[in-house]
């Protein structure tokens, strides 16, 4: 037991002084994710790929002209219009792309992407500038709340029951689809944003006390 305690103390003595560096790594990680994903919002496939989030969201659906509209899918079933114009990743369908242009899909994606990149850079700036870093961390937290709200508003979050030649018991809540598994990870971004913001806030207060 003594050997184990000595090992724990050895590791703790190495890790403890590196707290600031680890928090900076959190900032770098947040920035990488946000700049990469935000930057991809200028790409057609990524813009098309967020149509289900935007169309179903009470916070973002106003950005689209047609996506949230209910239309007949040709079988008498009323569905949201965006569902008739999905482009699978890696597949280019001209009529769907034209619809997305008319819908404002790409313009909305550019705005969302620019916002995400900005928040990522603000969070990264906390390494050197605590005020902007605190803002970035809090915005990361807020953005994560909005993203996680998609789990309530977006039907594609859950595995659908598509039928088959045998029962499909694993569908609906709590069975996350690939889309849902992507979104739920924003809980980590939310926590990281708060950690980054709190560390910046402590530096701001420490500097003001020193004056």
Swiss-Prot record:
Source taxon at top rank: Bacteria
Key words, A-Z: Cell membrane, Membrane, Transmembrane, Transmembrane helix
GO BP terms in the entry: response to hypochlorite
PANTHER family: INNER MEMBRANE PROTEIN RCLC
Topology in membrane: Multi-pass membrane protein
Any Pfam family hit: DUF417
InterPro entries in the cross-refs: RclC-like
Membrane-spanning ranges: 22-42, 111-131, 133-153
Keyword match Repeat: no
Protein name: Uncharacterized 23.0 kDa protein in purT/mpa1 5'region
Family statement drawn from the similarity comment of this UniProt entry: To E.coli YkgB.
């Amino acid at each position: 037991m003594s050997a184990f305690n000595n090992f724990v103390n050895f590791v703790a003595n190495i890790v403890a002084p590196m707290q600031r560096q680890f928090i900076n790594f959190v900032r770098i990680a947040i920035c990488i994710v946000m700049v990469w994903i935000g930057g991809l919002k200028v790409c057609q496939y990524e813009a098309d790929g967020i149509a289900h989030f935007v169309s179903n969201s009470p916070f973002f659906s106003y950005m689209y002209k047609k996506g949230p509209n209910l239309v007949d899918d040709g079988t008498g079933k009323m569905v949201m219009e965006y569902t008739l114009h999905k482009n699978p990743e890696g597949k280019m369908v001209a009529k769907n792309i034209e619809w997305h242009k008319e819908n404002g899909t790409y313009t909305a994606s550019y705005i969302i992407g620019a916002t995400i990149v900005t928040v990522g850079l603000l969070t990264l700036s906390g390494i050197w500038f605590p005020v902007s870093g605190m803002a970035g961390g809090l915005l990361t937290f807020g953005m994560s709340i909005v993203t996680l709200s998609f789990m309530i508003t977006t039907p594609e979050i859950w595995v659908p029951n598509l039928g088959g030649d045998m029962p499909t018991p694993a569908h609906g809540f709590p069975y996350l689809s690939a889309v849902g598994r992507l979104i739920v990870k924003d809980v980590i971004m939310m926590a990281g944003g708060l950690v980054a913001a709190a560390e910046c806030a402590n530096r701001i207060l420490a500097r003001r006390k020193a004056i």
